[in-house]
Amino acid sequence: MKRINLKRIAAAVIAVSSVFAGVYGSTVPSAAEPDEYHDDWLHVNENAEIVDMYGNPVWLTGCNWFGYNVGSQVFDGVWSRNMHEMLTEIADHGFNLLRVPMSTQLLLQWKNNEPDPATPKINEWTNPELTVEGVVGGKVKYSFDVWNQAVKWCRELGIKIMIDIHSAETASAGHQVSLWYTDKYSTEDWYEALEWLTDYYKDDDTLIAIDLKNEPHGKADVPSQMAKWDDSKDPNNWKYAAECAAEKVLAINPNLLIMVEGIEVYPKEGYDWTAPAKDWTTNTEFYYGAWWGGNFRGAKENPIDLGEHQSQLVYSPHDYGPLVYEQSWFHEGFTQESIMEEYWYDNWFYLLEEKTAPLLMGEWGGFIDEQHDPDGSNTKWLTCLRDLMIENRIHHTFWCFNENSGDTGGLVYDNFGTWDEDKYALVKPALWQDENGKFISLDHKFAIGANGISLSDYYSGEQPTLPSESIDTLIKGDVNNDK
């Protein structure tokens, strides 16, 4: 596969576009020549905007669909409905990015071509395409083959994919484990899984991002299980682990966006990571708390450093409402302004305001029906956050498509067969659309679903090109020099 190495022509690129100007200087990641699989890689410019290869700003507005992380070996819901039909509905509703939770365990299973521990939860009668014979009622395919079929369909539907390492071990409660390693799967196993995944899809820009680890968390009650953020090389230092993982991933594919989530707690002024969780005799709190994965206070003094690949960094907090947990900022009469002052700003919004890096809200969602939310407080929070993301073009993936998320519900119900139109109506204004209400894809070739347009359509197909006198000097070849 031919590539253009922009490191050799940084000056020419800067003359054409300001995409990688300023802080990135000559450390521009290699960009591929425009073609079906290499024209959609995304990068970050000096204004903390995510941009395409031409410097055009994009807005990642997607949703989550889980199943692979919990042991289903496939998206949940394929046990009843046709996978392609559901992916088509997601595209038609305008979600241009699919965040897919997986596990280190599953990726290593696929890497080693190990058999599925159980038959994937696929209805072979409604999914003949996912059977070995390709017929109704046939034998269900190997889970990795099914996954690659999903990738192909996403590509054709204009949906981009972000893989989320939701847990080390495949389990319905795997996200409850605070760190990226367990007794069964080490940090090295996590690295191995990430490297294999990156290498396998390095020539397919359907997969544009990796969320290195879902919701690192933990408190000082159990220090060894507490994800922390400092300048140490301690095994539970999330900052160090994330930088090491990102370095390995970007050495293989320097075009992937790297999503780094936050942690749960951070020491208050005058204290450090050796402080206890709380002094119960005086009721003194020694740490600032946050949602799991939502605390980026440590990034102010110790920001993530990806070296020459800094233009691939995106910080990815999670945020939920009072129906998940009655946090202190959900007091009576809360507003968008009060949440900003009491929680959002110091934990993650400052990163966007200071243009440190873009933000992608990796999870946000919840019930809005009268039965679950009788006083409307959860709906109020959702509206506050949605409006903030629209106003500031914060990227996001809504939690979730699934109906079987116990504390949030999903975009569908009735065994994945019916869309929750009220919830979708709340989310829809935060999906990337043009002035005519057409959904916008992150793909230059494929429109998003039946109701959208491609990225090239949105920008009228008028893309800047490199100066002709510089093209002759380009050195083309595989970006990793491994072919």
Residue spans of the language-model regions?
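Aromatic-lined substrate-binding rim segments of carbohydrate-active enzymes
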Residues: 75-172, 200, 237-254, 374-397
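Structural recognition of the beta-strand scaffold that forms the well-ordered cores
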Residues: 50, 58-65, 96-102, 106, ...
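Extracellular glycoside hydrolase catalytic/binding regions
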Residues: 79, 181, 191-208, 213-392
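Sec-dependent N-terminal signal peptides
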Residues: 7-19
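C-terminal segment of classical bacterial N-terminal signal peptides
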Residues: 19-29
